[in-house]
């Protein structure tokens, strides 16, 4: 959060340069995106299990919450910073690593956020950005790779249906 806010002017300029959003709106998006990082990092402190009374007085049920594993995140071009932080921050907060597939139109915001994550000391392999022109191939890989346990996607209904089919195959 702090590094995003310290670098908000540069992040906004990157966002404006890559997709044409007016600078004032880009600054607003950076601040909005940073709020997800702040909120989910604070919520991470409250991710713990539950102890539930059992069916007998001397029994109890213990619920343990564990990270699901690798999360594949596919984001749209129109809110490149906010959609990334909205998807990546909760996954990281609960201990999952992320493979982010930003859109081909706006990859620079993703790379800038990955750079800041690295600068913050995030270990290699935790927040990963994959780029390329074969969008359907990369989506299919995220959906079919056994290491990826969850997909988060924002985009068109048509692509959402394709991803849903690929995930269920």
Where are these regions (language model features)?
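Residue-level signal for inorganic ion chemistry
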Residues: 15, 37, 95, 127, ...
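Conserved NAD(P)+-binding/catalytic subdomain of aldehyde/semialdehyde dehydrogenases
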Residues: 70, 103, 119-169
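Hydrophobic packing residues within well-ordered alpha-helices of enzyme cores
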Residues: 37, 110-113, 142, 163
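A broad detector of the eukaryotic-type serine/threonine protein kinase catalytic domain
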Residues: 16-24, 76, 96, 135, ...
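Glycine-rich loop-to-alpha-helix module at the N-terminal edge of alpha/beta enzyme cores
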Residues: 1-48, 58
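Conserved small-residue-rich beta-alpha loop and adjacent elements
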Residues: 50-124
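Anion (oxyanion) recognition and catalysis
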Residues: 5, 92, 168
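Short alpha-helical
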Residues: 10, 21, 32, 79, ...
């Amino acid at each position: 959060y702090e590094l995003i806010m310290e670098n908000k002017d540069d992040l906004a300029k990157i966002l404006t340069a890559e997709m044409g959003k007016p600078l004032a709106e880009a600054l607003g998006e950076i601040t909005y995106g940073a709020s997800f990082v702040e909120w989910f990092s604070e919520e991470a402190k409250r991710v713990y299990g539950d102890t539930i009374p059992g069916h007998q007085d001397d029994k109890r049920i213990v619920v343990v919450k564990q990270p699901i594993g690798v999360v594949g995140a596919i984001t749209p071009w129109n809110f490149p910073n906010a959609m990334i932080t909205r998807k990546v921050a909760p996954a990281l907060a609960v201990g999952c690593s992320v493979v982010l597939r930003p859109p081909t139109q706006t990859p620079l915001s993703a790379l800038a956020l990955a750079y800041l994550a690295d600068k913050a000391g995030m270990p290699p392999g935790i927040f990963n950005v994959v780029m390329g022109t074969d969008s359907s191939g990369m989506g299919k890989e995220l959906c079919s790779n056994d290491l990826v346990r969850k997909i988060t996607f924002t985009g068109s209904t048509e692509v959402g249906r394709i991803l849903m089919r690929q995930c269920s195959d």
